[in-house]
Amino acid sequence: MYIYTVKPGDTLFDIAQKNGVTISALVAANQLSDPYKLPVGLALVIPGQSIRERSIVVNGYAFPGISDIALLGALQYLTYLSVFSAKTRIDGTITELNDTALIRKCYVNGVAPVLTLTNQRESGGFSGDIAHAVIADEEVKTKLIQNVMEYLDRRNYFGLNIDFEYVREEDRTLYTQFLLDFAAALRRVGYSFSVALAPKISQEQSGLLYTAHDYGAVGSIADKVIIMTYEWGYTYGEPMAVAPIDKVRQVLDYAVMEMPPEKILMGMANYGYSWTLPYKKGTAARPLSLSEIPQTAYSQYADIRFDLSLIHISEPTRP
């Protein structure tokens, strides 16, 4: 906690953004009867610790049950921690999380806690049917936005991340409007807003994972865009890297043509796979954690081929 003195031209929105807290937290901490009237010189209590400024912006995802050892080891490197996830129901309600302690630890360590909203079933797996139910019905959509806004305020989140996957191609325009409506509601009270997108290399790219994700539109709507640049190598696929550098580069080269580069957060896989060779089509690869990957290489006396000189992303000129 510390004190901020109101300066000429300050608004509550500006002060909240500048100090990494929500407007509701400022109002509650200072018992403001009229948040829209801030006299110059007023001393405002800024609750908690401000969000650290970094030379790069880093977002991490975590389940509420993450261990303290893993959490505290990661928080020192993060700008945002996206808590995964509140699941959307077809009636516009959401599942709630055991997230109170996690949010508090984020603020104590100068990290912004962000709620991730998904179209996952409660039994698991992303559902295009759930997405359609809440974006195609205005009444349900309004109810969902209201429920999310109330939850963000009640739990003192810093912002919202939307991760809707496998949205139907015919719902592309509806999904974009859904994001616009959420953005308007969030910005009225000063929340940050990010959207997760599938890794596209062109506007025309086909496939259920890609078609409803409009890079240009989302880039103009969201504060940050998290691009899922991974999963080329997958459980039942042929042996290959999870995130091949040439594939990642193709996605980012396209992305910076469609949206401001400073909005883009490149996704990084925190897992790998081990295939049994010779590979037989239809067989499953064994998933590996980041700590298991080098251990597996060492146990097989395999070389780890890591070349930093290959990791360079050019920035094409936007039209």
Residue ranges of each PLM-predicted region?
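Primarily a LysM-type cell-wall glycan-binding module
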Residues: M1-V21, L42-L44
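Second-shell loop/turn segments in exported
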Residues: L12, T88-I94, A131-E138, F164-R172, ...
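Substrate-binding surface in catalytic domains of secreted glycosidases
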Residues: I90-L97, T173-Q177, D181-Q300
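Glycan-binding loop/region signatures in secreted carbohydrate-active enzymes
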Residues: N119-G124, G128-A131, G272-S314, R318
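Glycan-recognition patch characteristic of GH18 chitinases/ENGases
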Residues: Q49-N147
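Active-site beta-loop-alpha junctions enriched in small/polar residues
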Residues: F63-G65, A86, T118-Q120, E165-V167, ...
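Hydrophobic faces of well-ordered beta-strands that scaffold small-molecule active sites
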Residues: V58-G60, L81-V83, P113-L117, L160-I162, ...
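Active-site groove signature of glycoside hydrolases
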Residues: I145-L174, I227-E238
